[in-house]
Amino acid sequence: MFKKIMIIITVLCMSASVACAQGKKNPVVEMETSLGKVKIELFEKEAPISVKNFLDYANSGFFSDTIFHRVIPGFMIQGGGFTADRKQKPTKAPIKNEAANGLKNDRGTISMARTSAPDSATAQFFINVVNNEMLNRPNPDGAGYAVFGKVVEGMDVVDKIVSVKTQNVNMVFQNMPVQPVFIKSVKVLK
């Protein structure tokens, strides 16, 4: 009898933990920009390192008053690292590239920006405005670009941002908006 009760309790506990794991929702953040709000679901299961990194920066207020410094129609909008006076904000150590997570750089996805070194991403990110298949394939450096979330509300705002007039300021700031587009805040909703 005791053995049957233990089996039943074990099965119930396992069922409850599976149900809890399945019921866990992905975090959602609201990015308030000077052109409107964008809600982004973050894919914690597929990109745990990138999501934790992004949430750490968001929760610390790091993204507040940064700009979208690279805006390219037919490609993407990039931000999260510079102030309006083109000063780069100090970041934490780079993270491991999670591009092999199975997620694709499709329209509306958010990915980690990086240099030509695969594991060089810190705070900067980009939102794809079209399907960017070439970013999924390993580049000459051996890696693609890590998707870690998707816009779930406010893609019209992203489209507004990508349509602003841009300029080439210098070799570092190519395709920079003439009038800065600010990230006012990034708040975790759930």
Model-assigned labels for residue ranges:
Residues 2-9, 13, 19-190:
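Cyclophilin-like peptidyl-prolyl cis-trans isomerases
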